[in-house]
Amino acid sequence: MALTHIESAADPRLETFRFVGDAAELERRGLVVVEGRLVVERLLADSTLQVHALLLTAAAARAMGVVLARVPASVEVFVVPQPWMQGITGFNLHRGSIAIARRPPAVSVEELLAGGARRLLVLEGVGNPDNVGGLLRTGRAFGVDGVVLGPGCGDPLYRKAIRVSCGAALVVPFAHDPDWPRALGVIRHHGIELVALSPNPSLPSIDDVAARRAPSRGVALLLGAEGPGLTDAALDAADVKARVPIDAASDSLNVTVAAAVALHVFR
């Protein structure tokens, strides 16, 4: 793999990097943007996404030498001076490393489950990219096999979501399915217990629900957006509803924290 040192910020070979802040244009071209050295390294080392090109500072290229040595020759690796980066990309959160990759084909819930997924996070209405990214990171930390995103959910491959996920969005399988609550029925049809999480104090605690479930059965934890929570349709589609027990002085948890607690209990 050869590094291409760019001598002019106007070099036409950098054209693709000039719209990395334009989500609509990225979607139109079927591309995703990965920023930050550690996340770019995860893309190169662990992800199945097809990498198109890299834009690095000289310092980042030196730091990533071992990983870059394994990059296929078909991937263009451009090196530019640090002061040029913001002018080329339009933002300054990249820490000297940006990658552009091809967006993978969409995966259905059926395809996700056909791959053997038995431990899932299922999201409804979670649109905030910080929460989407945080949930992907949490899911990877607790070994989920996949994430199902229903109506109103944000894109796990949105630039900020990838960054917040620390690259987990690049390796954890996920499926978007707007056909709701049909998708929830598909999950249950595969023998996976669907557990809906709600702050309703009248519900049994996740500890009690986890203690009663069959260890051999898969589990899908269903979470809604902060504030509105799950819709009645989603709650009605679940096998069981449960709450994360918290102090009576508090009304709820951040959705990422709730997911982490529940995944630990249902480990």
Across the structure, where does each feature detected by a protein language model lie?
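RNA substrate-binding interface of SAM-dependent RNA methyltransferases
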Residues: 4, 72, 78, 102-202
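Amphipathic alpha-helical repeat scaffolds
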Residues: 36, 127-134, 252-258
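Glycine/small-residue-rich loop that forms an oxyanion/phosphate-binding "nest" at active or ligand-binding sites
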Residues: 69-97
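Boundary-proximal intrinsically disordered activation/regulatory segments immediately upstream
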Residues: 1-67, 153-154
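Active-site/ligand-binding-proximal alpha/beta "capping" segment
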Residues: 195-250
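Short, aromatic/basic amphipathic alpha-helical patches
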Residues: 62-74, 234
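Structured adenosyl-cofactor binding patch, chiefly the S-adenosyl-L-methionine
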Residues: 97-99, 138-142, 153-169, 232-267
